[in-house]
């Protein structure tokens, strides 16, 4: 696993993919340094900055000024905030805006926003002119520690989440920790779920550190930077081993099979459930289901739930506002999960804290019965 290196006010985590390797820069002031960092790596480019209305109001002017100082022309493309922008309609709108600006294949798409903007922009960059340069500038904690790293891009459909997309690695990730100060407490908590996930997958020491230091992560400073860097280091190591998720990269989906089903069931309505909240509930359910299947002790599930509750995250189906459909309908959403192979269910389950594994051929009847029990409690 590549160790992060510290230079000036930022930490650099390398993602090792041969001639497609790139750096993740983590630290304060990277919006102001963006033009300089992009100019170092991509000579003579113009950029399209894809962002949403909320992020644009706070950060777009500073980013455009940074590019202007570096002699880089920029064209903003602003979309509506929220998961519903991960759609064919918005994909078409952004694509047409970039083509109308006459950007060329050697130019770059810059994603300034959270996971929605990053996933959408990366997909656009992968298909416009058969592939443009791509820079991630994640502005949410969730995007900084997860979706901006590793090259997964895409949009949602009526059939489920992230079902249409491409693998498209960025040339650079700039994670400005200062922009996290503008997040709502709910958004920050949602991103923290993905940080906790890395400890639960295979780093029990990191999970224990989070249990002891989560309040400092929330308040900012060195603990926050460390948590982000360690999360990126974990993900970078997995991506380097298994870029296209043919093996253990699937471990990164801990909590996501249940979580994505809940997002689909709530219509991607962020007033009811955001992605990180779905992941938190999904991880709690994965640990509960593992205990039910006699794969792990119930004390591991209780420890996970206790920590997620401590930071203010939901851990049960009862905490999803507006109610949920019957277990059979949730199973329909689970059947659309990307890990389904030839109709058989694959889950990320666990033997304990930091002992996650890929469980294939999980009996659908067992999952259905488990969901019925959890819904009954709700």
Swiss-Prot record:
Give the CC-aspect GO terms.
cytoplasm
Q: Which gene encodes it?
A: aroB
Which residues are noted in the entry as NAD(+)-binding? Answer: 115-119, 139-140, 152, 161
The subcellular location is: Cytoplasm
Q: Has keyword Cytoplasm? A: yes
Name assigned to this protein: 3-dehydroquinate synthase
Superkingdom of the organism of origin = Bacteria
Which species? Brucella suis (strain ATCC 23445 / NCTC 10510)
Entry keywords, A to Z:
Amino-acid biosynthesis, Aromatic amino acid biosynthesis, Cobalt, Cytoplasm, Lyase, Metal-binding, NAD, Nucleotide-binding, Zinc
Q: Does the keyword Calcium apply?
A: no
The family database entries (Gene3D superfamilies) matched by this protein are listed as: 3.40.50.1970, Dehydroquinate synthase-like - alpha domain
EC number(s) per UniProt? 4.2.3.4
**What are the BP-aspect GO terms?**
amino acid biosynthetic process; aromatic amino acid family biosynthetic process; chorismate biosynthetic process
**Residues that hold Zn(2+) according to the record:** 194, 256, 275
Q: Which InterPro entries match?
A: Dehydroquinate_synthase (IPR050071), DHQ_synth_AroB (IPR016037), DHQ_synth_fam (IPR030963), DHQS/DOIS_N (IPR030960), DHQS_C (IPR056179)
Pfam families attached here? Answer: DHQ_synthase (PF01761), DHQS_C (PF24621)
Manner of cofactor binding, per the entry note: Binds 1 divalent metal cation per subunit. Can use either Co(2+) or Zn(2+).
**Catalytic activity, reaction form:** 7-phospho-2-dehydro-3-deoxy-D-arabino-heptonate = 3-dehydroquinate + phosphate
Instruction: Give the GO molecular function terms.
Output: 3-dehydroquinate synthase activity; metal ion binding; nucleotide binding
Question: What's this protein's family per the entry?
Answer: Belongs to the sugar phosphate cyclases superfamily. Dehydroquinate synthase family.
């Amino acid at each position: 696993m590549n160790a992060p290196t510290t230079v000036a006010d930022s930490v650099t985590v390398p993602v090792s993919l041969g001639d497609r390797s790139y750096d993740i820069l983590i630290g304060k002031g990277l919006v102001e340094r963006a033009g300089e960092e992009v100019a170092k790596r991509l000579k003579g480019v113009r950029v399209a900055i894809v962002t949403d209305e909320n992020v644009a109001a706070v950060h777009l002017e500073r980013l455009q000024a940074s590019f202007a100082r570096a002699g880089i022309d920029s064209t903003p493309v602003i979309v509506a905030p929220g998961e519903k922008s991960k759609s064919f309609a918005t994909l078409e709108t952004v694509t047409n805006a970039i083509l109308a600006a006459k950007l060329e294949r050697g130019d770059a798409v810059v994603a300034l926003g959270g996971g929605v903007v990053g996933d959408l922009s990366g997909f656009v960059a992968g298909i416009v002119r058969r592939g443009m340069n791509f820079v991630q500038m994640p502005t949410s904690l969730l995007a900084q520690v997860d979706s901006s790293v590793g090259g997964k891009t895409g949009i949602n459909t009526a059939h489920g989440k992230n079902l249409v997309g491409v693998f498209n690695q960025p040339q650079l990730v700039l994670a400005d920790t200062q922009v996290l100060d503008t997040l709502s407490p709910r958004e920050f908590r949602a991103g923290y779920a993905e940080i906790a996930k890395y400890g639960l997958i295979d780093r029990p020491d990191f999970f224990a550190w989070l249990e002891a230091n989560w309040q400092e992560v929330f308040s900012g400073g060195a603990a926050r930077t460390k948590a982000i860097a360690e999360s990126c280091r974990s993900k970078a190591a997995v991506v380097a081993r298994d870029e296209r998720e043919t093996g253990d990269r699937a471990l990164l989906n801990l909590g996501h099979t249940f979580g994505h089903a809940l997002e689909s069931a709530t219509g991607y309505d962020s007033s009811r459930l955001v992605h990180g909240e779905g992941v938190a509930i999904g991880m709690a359910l994965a640990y509960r289901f593992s205990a039910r299947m006699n794969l792990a002790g119930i004390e591991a599930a209780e420890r996970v739930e206790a920590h997620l509750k401590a930071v203010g995250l939901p851990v049960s189906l009862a905490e999803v506002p507006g109610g949920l459909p019957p277990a059979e309908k949730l199973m329909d959403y689970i059947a659309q999960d990307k890990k389904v192979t030839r109709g058989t269910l694959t889950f990320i389950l666990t033997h304990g804290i930091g002992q996650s594994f890929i469980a294939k051929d999980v009996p659908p009847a067992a999952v259905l019965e488990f969901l019925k029990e959890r819904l009954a409690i709700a």
